[in-house]
Design a protein with these regions (language model features):
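Short, surface-exposed, charged loop/turn segments at secondary-structure junctions
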Residues: 45-48, 82-87
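Solvent-exposed loop/turn segments at secondary-structure junctions
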Residues: 2-7, 35-40, 67, 73-77, ...
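Functionally critical loop-and-helix segments that line ligand-binding/catalytic clefts
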Residues: 86-146
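Short, well-ordered coil↔helix boundary/capping segments
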Residues: 47-50, 70, 109-112
Length: 146
């Protein structure tokens, strides 16, 4: 889920869950894609961003839906360097270094995660695709996190 920062987080969570139920979609978890200028454009403080993302996480958790977090090193800029409330959730981070390993995060951990659950290591900028799918990002993990 790409949360729209200017829209009520509870409404977004409820709407997504309603659409998934209406479409009878089976899923194991919801991944919150926390990145981009809508989080760090100066309109919101780190505390406001913390409250927003925790409202989303709590809404899904209360509905019995597991949550994972997708983000990058912008995390500290978005939430502040002392925010660790998400560290109990699986972390999938982006670092487009074309290396499928976690060696890069060991030197620059963030968010209180002891280790990530997955890494997006290639962004498909060359237009790589499968069966006309459009550009693909490539992810890696040591073991399934979902």
């Amino acid at each position: 889920m790409w949360p729209e920062r200017g829209v009520n987080p509870l409404d977004q969570a409820r709407q997504l869950l309603r659409h998934l139920a209406d479409a009878r979609v089976q899923y194991d978890s919801i991944m919150l894609d926390i990145e981009g200028s809508n989080w760090i454009n100066g309109s919101y403080t780190a505390i406001q961003n913390q409250d927003f993302v925790m409202a989303l996480v709590n809404a899904f958790t209360e509905a019995g839906v597991p949550v994972a977090i997708y983000c990058s090193w912008q995390f500290n800029q978005t939430f502040g360097s002392n925010f660790t409330s998400l560290s109990r959730l699986p972390l999938i981070y982006a670092h487009y270094d074309n290396i499928p390993s976690y060696v890069d995060i060991a030197d620059s951990p963030f968010g209180g995660w002891p280790s990530p659950s997955g890494k997006q290591f290639f962004d498909g900028a060359g237009g790589e695709q499968i069966c006309g799918s459009g550009a693909l990002d490539w992810d890696w993990s040591r073991e399934p996190w979902w």
